[in-house]
Amino acid sequence: MMLEHVLVLSAYLLSIGIYGLITSRNMVRALMCLELILNAVNMNFVTFSDLFDSRQIKGDIFSIFVIAIAAAEAAIGLAIVSSIYRNRKSTRINQSNLLNK
């Protein structure tokens, strides 16, 4: 696959993720958009690692670390959303004012 195609796809994923993160009112959807952003970053790491020096796998290893951190972030985020839903009966961002209790 050509470099430009991968970068355009990564830019689309990044822009969709940022747009969804800004406009989302649901916490689960916001977490999914954050995962899209992290996947776009991973695509860039792997692409540029292969472009500059295909013998070294620094970009691939860094992508594996980002995937592991994203998995932990998703697990913790979903646990927090589940706890908020149990207490507030809603996962909407604008309805869950956690500072007022």
Curated annotation (Swiss-Prot):
This is NAD(P)H-quinone oxidoreductase subunit 4L, chloroplastic. It is a multi-pass membrane protein. NDH is composed of at least 16 different subunits, 5 of which are encoded in the nucleus. Its main location: plastid. GO terms for biological process: ATP synthesis coupled electron transport; photosynthesis, light reaction. It catalyses: a plastoquinone + NADH + (n+1) H(+)(in) = a plastoquinol + NAD(+) + n H(+)(out); a plastoquinone + NADPH + (n+1) H(+)(in) = a plastoquinol + NADP(+) + n H(+)(out). It is an enzyme of class 7 (translocase). It is found in: Plastid, Chloroplast thylakoid membrane. The chain crosses the membrane at residues 2-22, 32-52, 61-81. Coiled coil: none annotated. GO terms for molecular function: oxidoreductase activity, acting on NAD(P)H, quinone or similar compound as acceptor; quinone binding.
